[in-house]
Amino acid sequence: VFTRRKSKEAEPSTSTGTQIRRFELEDLDVGMKAIARDAYGSPTVLERRDIDKPEIGDAEMLVRVHAAGVDRGVWHVMAGLPYPIRLAGYGLRAPKNPVIGSDVAGVVETVGNDVTRFQPGDEVFGIGKGTFAEYACALEDKLAPKPTKLTFEQAAAVSISGLTALQGLRDHGRVKPGQKVLVIGASGGVGTFAVQIAKAFGAQVTGVCSTTKVDLVRSIGADHVIDYTREDFAEGEQRYDLILDIGGNSSLSRLRHVLTSKGTLVIAGGETEGRWLGGTDRQIRALLLSPFVGQKLGTFVCSENHEDMIVLKDLIEAGKLTPVIDRTFSLSEVPEAIRYLEEGHARGKVVITLEHNDRI
């Protein structure tokens, strides 16, 4: 929105004997461009708008967005499905925040009174609120300095997918050097990080993906790659110490069949059409069964925190982790980007890029 503030009065003109009022350009509040919606639904509910910049709290920062990542969580928040998403604070009947998007990379514009780690001008990456916009609000504890070797587009691809992979393997999978790890969904956003992080921890990694993505998974370090269109991982003789299931929908019995007797299964994904559970029924069954078997079966919710963002940053700067970007889209193309991801085309991450010199 363009808002004209009260004009400032100029000195009287001596040449005409009349007073002149002039408007100064700096008194125009430009606002920002954003992709917003008023209702839950498909990508058709999204539209480009001129809106006010977000206001920040004492522990927050205003970030000028250079790039924003797209992940499955974006689709869930956009659609309001499964329904528990709405109960988690996103709005019961209509979305509370019209702008979606979480992954962000950009430059700090302003900081709140309690912010100590960052100052205006710092390049950062992490997790914000409403990042499909020219400016986004973010908590200090959910950002980290952008790795110098990454572009803004690469940095925007890291946070949510990288944290999910890191915590799934390290905290819930307890991965150790020499273990055999199976990553199901190895070519996706989380999967491409998981393969590299498991290798960084010294594991022997097998990735599961489709035919067209085999070369990609092999190129990022997988020791073995299973093309699920030609081979069923559950029918082989190999047993795994840890399975990270990101994109699959295999039954618990099939997954347990290829686990060692004391192995660990971590479910971090898998979608169904259910409007209430949306695939989480499998996670729930795993949690209920785990106490009664020798194997550890479970799931988790990613923790968005500064400390683990620094771990990812260190892995990147050590050359052990590189974001895999499939395609980039402009801010105006956010609906197309979400459709592309939803249809399963992505090899790695999908990223939204913003050019601030071009007002879209």
Predicted segments — roles?
Residues 246-321, 354-360:
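Glycine-rich phosphate-binding loop and adjacent beta-alpha segment
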Residues 52-69, 83-130:
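Glycine-rich beta-strand-centered segment in the early N-terminal region that forms part
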Residues 155-227:
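Mid-domain Rossmann-like dinucleotide-binding core that forms the NAD(H)/NADP(H) cofactor-binding site
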Residues 128-140:
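A structural motif shared across PLP-dependent enzymes of the aminotransferase-like
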Residues 123, 180, 263-264:
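Short glycine-centered segments of the SAM/dcSAM-binding site in methyltransferase folds
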Residues 2-4, 19-30, 303-360:
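C-terminal hydrophobic helical "lid"/dimerization subdomain
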Residues 235-242:
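A short acidic, Gly/Pro-enriched loop at the edge of an enzyme's catalytic core
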